[in-house]
Amino acid sequence: MAMLLGASVLILWLQPDWVNSQQKNDDQQVKQNSPSLSVQEGRISILNCDYTNSMFDYFLWYKKYPAEGPTFLISISSIKDKNEDGRFTVFLNKSAKHLSLHIVPSQPGDSAVYFCAAS
């Protein structure tokens, strides 16, 4: 099963970056689409991810701190449009090929690199 990753950075005033998927061709199939995001502690943080392949049926979010490996946060299958786990909620809009991660409330410990993945 192939898995594609995009990444963004959350620095409590979230600094998401564009990252190419790990495809060998130029077609980006998963990408983060927020160039920057400023969030106050206690507010909602929203990270967005778009994908191009309608055959994807499973979507995951990971969090990575410097000098550590990625940690799984939350996932959603293509048969759902919402999944909640504690402060994290992921929304999936299949017709728009878009998913978003909502973090409520934002905390200083949320400052990290966030990865969106699809398979």
UniProtKB/Swiss-Prot annotation:
Q: Name one GO cellular component term.
A: T cell receptor complex
Q: Read off the InterPro entries from this record.
A: Ig-like_dom, Ig-like_dom_sf, Ig-like_fold, Ig_V-set, TCR_variable_domain
Report the Gene3D superfamilies cross-referenced here.
Immunoglobulins (2.60.40.10)
**What is this protein's function per UniProt?**
V region of the variable domain of T cell receptor (TR) alpha chain that participates in the antigen recognition. Alpha-beta T cell receptors are antigen specific receptors which are essential to the immune response and are present on the cell surface of T lymphocytes. Recognize peptide-major histocompatibility (MH) (pMH) complexes that are displayed by antigen presenting cells (APC), a prerequisite for efficient T cell adaptive immunity against pathogens.
Would I find Membrane among this entry's keywords?
A: yes
Per its record, how is this protein called by name?
Answer: T cell receptor alpha variable 29/delta variable 5
Molecular functions per Gene Ontology: MHC protein binding; peptide antigen binding
Task: State the encoding gene.
Answer: TRAV29DV5
Assembly and partners? Answer: Alpha-beta TR is a heterodimer composed of an alpha and beta chain; disulfide-linked. The alpha-beta TR is associated with the transmembrane signaling CD3 coreceptor proteins to form the TR-CD3 (TcR or TCR). The assembly of alpha-beta TR heterodimers with CD3 occurs in the endoplasmic reticulum where a single alpha-beta TR heterodimer associates with one CD3D-CD3E heterodimer, one CD3G-CD3E heterodimer and one CD247 homodimer forming a stable octameric structure. CD3D-CD3E and CD3G-CD3E heterodimers preferentially associate with TR alpha and TR beta chains, respectively.
The residues covered by the Ig-like domain are 22-119
Transmembrane spans: none
Report keywords, A-Z: Adaptive immunity, Cell membrane, Disulfide bond, Glycoprotein, Immunity, Immunoglobulin domain, Membrane, Receptor, Signal, T cell receptor
